[in-house]
Regions:
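Eukaryote-biased recognition of intrinsically disordered, low-complexity regulatory segments
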Residues: 1-9
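N-terminal cofactor/phosphate-binding cores enriched in small/glycine residues
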Residues: 13-75
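Fe-S ferredoxin-like electron-transfer domains
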Residues: 53-150
Length: 153
């Protein structure tokens, strides 16, 4: 199996070729926040790897930030996961996501164990700078849609 050697936050490691930066960082205990796996239908947001941009990292020699969930590790790559530039980008992305999110956290069934809420808190977001009209989406009331609020377990 072919491997590549890289450095993440001053820790050198070797990973199989094709490993993403997110996977490599996780393998050495470095947490990079990501929302790729979250179900964000209530935001009307299709959450595919690389779409949310919360997991961006700085790669030495590149001008732009890269989504760690999509960027494969390359030989000699040097990655920084928590620089001021990275943190500011994550805050901006999170504020943009939250600006179109219903502000009903206190009455939400996920309150207290919501990854979105926890990430906003860890990034120090107390208010949203981006104001404006929220997106409006037609509610699908067809009989084939299962309404979770109607299911009692």
């Amino acid at each position: 199996m072919e491997t590549v050697r890289l450095t993440i936050d001053n820790k050198t490691l070797e990973v199989p070729k094709g490993t993403t930066i997110l996977e490599a960082a996780k393998s050495i205990g470095i947490h990079i926040p990501s929302l790729c796996y979250m179900k964000l239908e209530e935001l009307h947001y299709e959450n595919n790897p690389g779409a949310c941009r919360i997991c961006v990292v700085e790669i030495e020699g590149r001008r732009n930030l890269a989504p760690s969930c999509k960027q494969e590790c390359t030989e000699g790559m040097v990655v920084y996961t928590h620089t001021p530039r990275v943190i500011n980008a994550r805050k901006t992305v999170m504020e943009l996501l939250l600006s179109n999110h219903p502000a009903e956290c206190l009455t939400c069934s996920s309150n207290g164990h919501c990854e979105l809420q926890n990430l906003a808190h860890s990034l120090g977001i107390r208010q949203i700078r981006y104001k404006g009209e929220m997106s409006e989406f037609e509610i699908d009331r067809s009989p084939s849609i299962v309404r979770l609020s109607l299911i009692h377990i």
